[in-house]
Amino acid sequence: MKFNFITLFPEKIQSYFSEGLQQKAIESGIFSINTIQLRDFSGNKHNRVDDTIYGGGPGMLLRVEPIHKALLSLGENKGIVILTSPSGIPFHQGIANKLKETGKPLTFISGYYEGVDHRVAEHLVDMEMSLGNYVISAGDLASICIADAVSRLLPGFLGAGESLLDESHNYPDVLEYPQFTKPSEYNGWKVPEVLLSGNHASILAWREQNRKKIDPDQERKL
């Protein structure tokens, strides 16, 4: 699978995917990344890709022209085009699964400043996606998160296939069961005896009974 990133900061993207499991997966040919510097398509000597807003307003918008040219440079390899934007649909595990199943390349357009000329969303992208109801400093962070969530679903990325099935968010409104490692007791805090028993049926039953429900009231702790 291939991930394209149209960005002002290619080094941020490259840095994230140059270590850990991501690096190993790329070296193994499980997926590949391609970063496109948006400024290369600015069309002006100052390499500016943003401009003021028609009708007035604070800040600057990314222009449609350089984004269009960057997409054209990818040809048929652009696949599904995703604009990361605060106004996009909230990304979740179900979307990650669907994107992986398509097998198509994914091309991410990262938003910056006040956002992107609306004609990009209207004419050039397949999906607008957000990480949630909050604003981050650059769309690159969202692009990386989405690509990471999809890439780790690819065959061979993780050693154990079962680990994908047991993860949080594969079950609606339910999180992963509690997990423990050595020592079996620390500071008076003990690992449940059933997990030390070696009885796989009992362990499985305990895990199912102790899957954590999503608690909507956690904000009260703040």
Swiss-Prot record:
A GO term, aspect molecular function: tRNA (guanine(37)-N1)-methyltransferase activity
EC numbers for this chain: 2.1.1.228
SUPFAM superfamilies membership: alpha/beta knot
Record gene name: trmD
Family according to the record: Belongs to the RNA methyltransferase TrmD family.
Any single Pfam family the record assigns to this protein: tRNA_m1G_MT
Organism whose genome encodes this protein: Leptospira borgpetersenii serovar Hardjo-bovis (strain JB197)
Protein name from the UniProt record: tRNA (guanine-N(1)-)-methyltransferase
Function per UniProt: Specifically methylates guanosine-37 in various tRNAs.
